[in-house]
């Protein structure tokens, strides 16, 4: 029996509809099917516009879209280096347990090394034990003492309004 051929390649703007489909499938898997607000124009603007905000790799199995990894650069003040944050890693159910997820992460890891980034990081839902098991098997460590914090939408606007009500901000990075 012929083993399927997997190809990992950089996504192009022509892949934007497939990327959006992957994002929606991942949201469904993560029990948040109504949380996706991203549109095709958002993906095109932020992936291929003048201010590129993310990079994306696609996995194909025998020419069919099988999964993706979407990532962006961050910075560690403690390490004094840029790093890479993997925002989304997703492999369609029909293609799981074939090495595609590992191949996608390995490709992002190779990019990190090539770009002088000494680490990758990502978030995983506590209940997603298959993913946690996979990540630990490839050498990832859980950061038990860290918690992700997020502020968005109206709470973000409320916080931003505090900068114009009596406090002075000299630059976007000032605290």
Where in the sequence are the language-model features?
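Conserved beta-strand in the GNAT
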Residues: 58, 64-73
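Conserved GNAT acetyl-CoA-binding A-motif
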Residues: 113-123
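Conserved GNAT-fold acetyl-CoA-binding loop/helix
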Residues: 20-45
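A short beta-loop-alpha structural element at the N-terminal edge
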Residues: 7-19
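A short helix-loop-beta-strand connector motif used in the catalytic cores of GNAT acetyltransferases and
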Residues: 45-58, 85
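A short, internal acetyl-CoA/4′-phosphopantetheine-binding micro-motif in the GNAT/acyltransferase core
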Residues: 89-96
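Conserved active-site alpha-helix within GNAT-family acetyltransferase domains
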Residues: 102, 106, 126-145, 158
């Amino acid at each position: 029996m012929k083993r399927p051929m997997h190809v990992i390649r950089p996504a192009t703007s022509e892949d934007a509809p497939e990327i959006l489909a992957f994002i929606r499938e991942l949201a469904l898997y993560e029990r948040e099917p109504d949380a996706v607000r991203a549109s095709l124009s958002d993906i095109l603007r932020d992936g291929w516009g003048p201010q590129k905000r993310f990079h994306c790799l696609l996995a194909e199995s025998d020419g069919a879209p099988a999964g993706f990894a979407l990532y962006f650069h961050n910075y560690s003040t403690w390490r004094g280096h840029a790093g890479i944050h993997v925002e989304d890693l997703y492999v369609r159910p029909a293609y799981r347990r074939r090495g595609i997820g590992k191949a996608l992460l390995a490709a992002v890891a190779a990019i990190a090394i090539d770009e002088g980034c000494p680490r990758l990081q990502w978030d995983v839902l506590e209940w997603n034990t298959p993913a946690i098991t996979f990540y630990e098997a490839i050498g990832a460590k859980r950061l038990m003492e860290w918690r992700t914090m997020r502020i968005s939408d109206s709470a973000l606007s409320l916080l931003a309004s505090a900068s114009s009500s009596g406090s002075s901000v000299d630059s976007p990075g000032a605290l």
